[in-house]
Each structure stands twice: as structure tokens, then as C-alpha cells.
Amino acid sequence: MEEQVANAIEIAGNPTSDQTLKAQAFDYLNQLRTDPSGWQVCLTLFTKTPQYSEIIRHVALEVVNSAAQAGLIDPQALGYVRDGLMAYLRQVYGQDNVTPDSTSIQNKIAQTITFLFSALYGNGWETFFDDLLSLTYKSSASTSHDNPLGIVFYLRVINAIHEEIGDVLVSRSRTEQDKANLLKDLIRSRDMQKIASSWQQILSEWRDGNDTIVEMSLRAVGSWVSWIDIGLVVNQTTLDLLFQQLGRAQKAELREGEEKVRDAAVDVFTEIIGKKMKPEDKMDMIIFLNLDTIVTQLSNSPPLHENRFTFKYDTDLAETVAKLVNITVIDIVRALEQDTVTADCKAKATGLLQAFLPHILRYFSDEYDEVCSTVIPCVSDLLSYLRKIAKVNPALAEQHSSILLPILKAIIAKMRYDETSSWGDEDDQTDEAEFQELRKRLGVLQQIVASVNEQLCMEAVSEVVGNTFESLRQSGAQLDWRDLDLALHEMFLFGEVAVRAGSLYSKGVPNNAAAERLVEMMLKMVESDIRSFTHPATQLQYMEICVRYSSFFQYHTHLIPTVLESFLQLVHHPIKKVKTRSWYLFQRLVKQLRTHVGNVAQTVVEALGDLLVINAELPTEGSDGDEMSSEDHEGSADAVFNSQLYLFEAVGIICSTPTVPADKQVLYAQSVLNPVFMDMEKNLAPAKANDERALLQIHHDIMALGTLARGFSDWMPGTSSPASLPAPEVSEAFMQVSEATLVALESLKTSFNVRTAARFAFSRLIGVLGSRILPQLPRWIDGLLTQTSSRDEMALFLRLLDQVIFGFKSEIYSILDALLTPFLQRVFSGIADAPTGTDDEVQLAELKREYLNFLLAVLNNELGAVIISERNQPMFETVIGTIEHFAKDIEDFTTAKMAFSVLSKMGSSWGGPDITPEGANGAAPQQQALPGFGQFMITRLSPLCWALPATPSFNSKDAQAKQVLAEAGGLQRTIYAKTGMEYLQYLRDRELPGMGMGADLVEEFVGALGRLDMKGFRQFFPSFIQRLSA
């Protein structure tokens, strides 16, 4: 059988094996894994001499591992595995072996041994550590750990055991954690002294002999220190050994692998400081270890000091030391923050903070971002502590300026692009993203500094910005773009201090001293020659700042032409990233300065003309064959078009300002519209023939038309009807847009993209056309709700219709009356189609809710009569039927709740005046009663309230179920308000007894309905049902 298993492993692992044979081999090995006796043959395969190939031995041991972890090996048999593996280890690792196992095999054995430790150390293998330690000696006569192969394996297992039971980053179940804690307790009580002694001895005996052994020993000490007695590590013997290894940092040249030993020694100190202790003990520990001196010596070592600004600079060591500084300072600040620590402890912490401040600044200002990032947590903690005490005693803020100022200067300096950065390079996108993330984190720190001492921050930023603009004035384009970018970035951040309620000004004057400074900075920036901003990064910053502080221009209107001229240059930028971003920023700027830009409308329209040409490009395929979506890349054709739309909106905004006469508005609008109309006309025939590019071109054209309309009107559907529609001649121009869109839609309504664009245009045209659009509503519905429209499309259009109803309720009745039945028939067909997957189910639920929302919009806007008009009455039964169905849907409580809301509203609308006090409607206007509706509510709607709780799977304690029941209770209270005693009598005589309810419960329910108001009964009904269900 051994040969059979070995053969199967060889076949499975050979890339050239026949695929059928390979599949059979995999099946065989999978069966072997679950075979209770499979592990035995695999253990033999692994330990046999002469040895099988590495892949056979690796897979064989893997089978043993999985069998042990799956519980296929009983405790007694685990002892057999232990004996087999230990015999192998003594034979192969217990002596000088010319061909040791590979690292992957060693790791696999260590994994198995670690599992056996977990299973047997508590009971069955109490000599575990003695047995492993015996491997570190060449013979029983050895007086020192003289077997390097055995030592490496012993340390490999030691480190694996920490990962198994001590590593806090490993996620464990409660049971696993309890077991880990038990094993740690056993080690501490049985073997810890012995293990710690072995580390000391190995470090001492091999300190200069084998870097791998020394590094693994240090890793073991560093990892285990977190859960063992600190005295086993912090003692003179061990510390002397650690200091010896730290001494390697003083070497100018290290042999290969030696730097790992040095870094591991620093990490031991980091782990010691990271160990949980009382603040008093931790401060004493920092002082005892003399960490200030250690860090100073490391910082002054050749790799970090002499090599600092050279290519030899050791960033790994810098990051390692930075970790030590970070964890130490975090603990110092923690001691300072705690109110419960002694005065002596606080004094020690204060002294340590002063000692470590140079170390913080040294690594925080390191030119390598990964080193700087390492100490950001401790800088953040320190600044947060200073902010906390400054709030308690503002006078202390000034005292701490000696700490704050150098940190602030370091923050600002680190925000500068370094000399090696090349902005916009495709190959450097990761570096750019990481730098921007670092800037973001540094920006947070700067805001904390500002909150501690605003004046200090103001002076520092003013100095950087002022000096930079002075240099710009003198040297112009020769100024390093990185310096200008830094100044602009600081201006952008400064708004966090200067801007209040979205503006630099309050009642016409700057908000505060910071706002005054920022106004000065803005004057210097805008008055600088834009041609000096030669780098794309600074050009983008310039635009971002103008938009962020647009309120500045409302009080310096003489500068608006200068800024607009700059923007009009930048919207034609040769770099796509700058150009497309500038389109968005231009739209933002003119929107915020709308009242001041009408006088340049013609100039702007003419200047933008070449950028308003629409050129649809089909998505290109990525390297994996998938189409790139617009979100995939900012430079994709889709993303560029989405940015281009901002220009159409900007034109609409500028052309529609009150200072532009109506005839000019029409002229400018038509200069943009006519080319688009011509393009649509040209592409309509090929689009009908399913030419994909022509269809996309029509989509883009319609989106552009809708976006131009959005620029002309501020009104958003669903808020209220436009307070003042554009001039009639402007609206007339946009009627052409509506007509052109409808013509395209009617011809291409099977295209999802065209429908999507048309729906967008429709929502935007409402704002410029107002009620003029209503007569076209049947055509819009016919084009937007087709046989191929998805439920999602229907739901979105229903939402739009809600807004139309709200905006034009006084004018829409006759149109709504004419289109309601065919419209609802399409919605019903969407609801009736069976969903085919999760996405479908989500869309169906959304469509149901939007349908109910639509009915509520009709009823709430006093248009309920349209549902029961002569034309739509044949549809009434279907409407009620769908609502009844939703009200009984136990799978969708949200929809059920809405269904009861709609029924209650129908009752309020058509049930006539309230005949009981405290009716459902309160002071709402009463609508004319629908004859027979009172009886309809009693016999048809009332039983619905009991249908859902009668479902066997209904849980009356569920929070959402209670909400549905409260709504059902509201419907019952509405029926009672409209029908009074007739309803109570019906409940008492027929409905409740018919459900099998006893006389006492009937009287309780009827009494509550007659006695309680709406709020009271909505609370009563869920609790009544809960008692019935108990």
C-alpha cells in the first residue's frame, strides 16, 4: 500500500501527468485523508529510510496532520505518532546530518509536533520540552548545546508553540482560548525556567557562531515575553546578551543575514515594553532598561546616522527602532493621562517624555514615509493628551509650544513631496496613493495641533505660505513645484480652522483671525501669475482652493474674471487627469458664484465650445478580457464623458443667471443644443439598426441635454414646484429637448441605456418645463416602461412620478386619470413575474414598495379620486388585491407595514367624515365618501388585520412584526372612526367569534377599540396578539 500511496502522490504532483490519472490520484488521496487508518501508512512513508522524494514526504505528513486535527487519531495512537516522529528526529536531527530536511519539511514537522504538544502536554507527554531539548546536544556527554540542526528545530517548535497558544493576533474560539490559557499555565509551572535558561545558554554559546540560531532565539524571547514572568527576560544575564547583539548596529558593514539578528534584538526590547504592566512599573522598566540611551546609540549608529542621506541608509533598522520609540512613548503618555497614577510616576513620565521628544522628532521627520508612519500613533496620542490638558487649563497651551512647534514643523515638512517623486507617472500610482494617505494622517495631526494652539498653527502656516509666494514672485517658474504644492496644500487644510458654516465670512467680515490670514493668502495666490503654476499638481491645487474658498470671491468680485480666465485655460489642459478634474471644479465654481458670472456667459460658451463635442467610445476590453467599466479607471471613456457632463451643467448655470436677458439665454442654449440635436438625428438610423456606438452616442446626447437642463434650473423633483420657472421662451427651447428625447426614446425604447438616459433627462426637464411636461407624460411612460423594462427601472420611475404628483398636484388630475390604468398594468406585470435570483428578489421588493409609495403619493396629495374614477374603476379590484396580498406577506414585513398604511389612508380618504371622537385623520381635510366603502372596510379590510398573525410561522415578538401589527391596529382604528358602532357590532357578533375567540377576549378587544385613541390602540393590538400567541 505504501508504494500505491507514493505513486498516487507522484502522479498528483507531476504537471505532465495524464489528466484522467491525475484526477484518480486526487480522489484516492482525498479518500486516504478520511480513512481512519490512512495516516499510519503515511507516517511510515515519511519516516522511512532511504527517504522518499520531498513531495511524497510533504504530502504524507500533511495527511497525518489533517487526520490528527480531524480527530481520526485517538490519544493512544497519538502517542504512537509521537514516538515515531521523535525516533525520526533523534536519528536525523540529533546528530550532524550531511543532508538535513528542507525548510518546508522542517516547518511541516514542527507543525505536527506543535499539534501533538497541544494534545498531549497536559496528559501523556509531560517530558515534551526535555525531549526536544535533547535534540540540541550531539550526545548525552555534551556539556553545551552543540547540535545546530537540533537547536534550529527546537527553536522552530518554540516559535510555533507561541503562535499556537500565545499570539494575540491569532483569532481563537472561547474553547480554544481556554485550552491555550491552560497550556500556558502548565508551561509556566513546569518548564518555563528550563526554557528561559536554554535561551540564555544558546544565545551565549552561539552569539558569534550562527546568525540563524541567534535570530531564532531572539524571536523566541521576544514573542514569549508577553505571557511569561518578566524576570525571566529582564535579568542581567539575558540583558547583557541582548546588549551584545544590539552592538551589531555599531558595525559599518554587516555580513549577510546579520541585520536580521540586530533587528530581532531591538524587537525584544519593543516586546518587553509592550508587555502589560501598571504605569508605575512600566516607567520604572523604561528607566531600568535605559531605553533613552539605547535609542540614542541606535540612532547614532553608522546605518542610521552616517548613512542617513545615502543609498546605504538602513530603513529596516530605522523602522525597527521607530517601533520601539512608538510603543515607549505611547506608554509614557498613558501614564501622564491617568489620574490614578502617583505623583512620582507622573514626574518620571514627564522626564521620560522630554528625553524621548528628540527621538519622536528624529523618526517622525525621517525621509522614508514608512518610518514616519510607524511613530504616527504615538505622536497622535501625545497631541491628543496635550489637547486634553489645554482644554482643562488653556494657559498650559502656551507652555507646551516648545513641544508643539517642532512637531508642527515636522508635520508640515513631511507633507512635501520628496525629491524622487514624479507626479502623475503611471508606474508611481501606488506610491502616490500611499503618500496621499500619509498626508491625510498628517492633516489630522495638524488639526489637533491647531485645536491646542491655534495661534501657533496660524503663524507656522502663514510663514510657509508667505515665504513661498514671495519666492514665487521673485523667481516665478524657477520655484520648485514641490514647495508651491506644499504651500497650496497647507492653504487647503487651513480651511478647517478658518471656515465656519461653509464660508470664510460672517455678516460680511472674516469669521476669525484665521479667516483673515486665509483671505491674505488667497489674495497672494490669485494675484500670482497662473503661468507660474507650471506643474499639474499645483494647477489642480489652485482650482481646488478657489472652489473651497469661493466665498472669498463674493467679497473680491474684481478677481472673478482673473480666476475664470485661469480656469478656462486649465479646462483645456493637455493632461487628461487635470483636464477632467478641472471640468468638475469649473462647474462647482460657477455654481457657487452664479450671481457674479452672467456678464461673461458668451465668452464662456464660446471658450468651451470645442469641449462640448460628444464622442461616444465603446468600452475597451481589459487584459483579462473583461470590459472596463467607468469605475475601473478615471481615464476610461465613460469616466471622461461623466466629467464632460459637468461642462454642460456649467454652461446651463452661467447662461441662466438673472443678469442674462431671456433672449440671450435662448441664444446660448440653442448654440449648445443644436449640435446635439443634429448629432442625434445623424445617429438615429444606425442606432435603430442596433449599431452599438450609435446607441451609446444617443445615450450620451440625451444625458448631455438633461444635464444642461439641470444647469438651467435649481429645482430638484420632490422638493416643491419651481418657485420661478425660466422665462417662457427658455422653457420653449427646452420643449425641443423634451421632444427630441421622446423621439429617440420612442424609436429606441428597447435599449436599456437609452431608457436610462431618458429617465434622467425627464427628471431634469421637469425643473425647466414645469407643468408644460404633463401633456407628454403618457409618451414618457410608454417609452420608459416597456416589456423589457426591469423592475429596477419601474421602481425608479415610480419614484419620479411621486415627485411629479407632489410638484403638480393641482394640474395633473386629468392626465393621471387617463394614464393610470395602462401604467399600473405594466407595474402589475413587473410584480407578477417570478424572481429568478437574489438580485431579482431585492428588485421585486423595491418595486412593491415604490408601487405602494406611489399610491400613498396619490392619496396624500388629494388625488385619490383618480383611483376610483369611472375610467379606472375596473382596475380598482386589482389594486386592492395586490395590497391585500402584500399585507399578508410574512417574508417582507416592510412591504406589509406599508400595505396597511395605504389601506388606512384609503379609509381616511373614502370612508367619509369621522363619526367617533379622535378619528384617524385629526384635522386633515375630509374627502367625499365613496358609497359602500364603509361596509367594504368592515367585511374586506378588517379580516386582513388577523391574516398575518394567523400564519403558523409568524413571530409576534419580532420587532418588525410588532411594527406591522401596530399599522394593522391603525387600520382597525380608522375603520372604527368611519363606521363606529356598526364595526364594533360586526366584530362582536361575527368576525371575532368566527375566529374562535372567547367572549371575554372579544369584549376586551372591542372595549379597547371603542375606548382607546389611535396611538393607544396601535400599542394595544401588538400586545393583544402577543398574548394570544403565548
UniProtKB/Swiss-Prot annotation:
Locations listed in the record: Nucleus; Cytoplasm
Give UniProt keywords alphabetically: Cytoplasm, Nucleus, RNA-binding, Transport, tRNA processing, tRNA-binding
Which molecular function terms from Gene Ontology are attached? small GTPase binding; tRNA binding
Q: Which biological process, per GO, is one annotated for this protein?
A: tRNA processing
> Record's Gene Ontology CC terms?
cytoplasm; nuclear matrix; nuclear pore
Keyword RNA-binding tagged? yes
Output the Gene3D superfamilies linked to this UniProt entry.
Leucine-rich Repeat Variant
Protein's job: tRNA nucleus export receptor which facilitates tRNA translocation across the nuclear pore complex. Involved in pre-tRNA splicing, probably by affecting the interaction of pre-tRNA with splicing endonuclease.
Tell me which family the UniProt entry assigns to this protein: Belongs to the exportin family.
Q: What's the protein name? A: Exportin-T
* Protein's organism: Aspergillus niger (strain ATCC MYA-4892 / CBS 513.88 / FGSC A1513)
Give the gene symbol.
los1
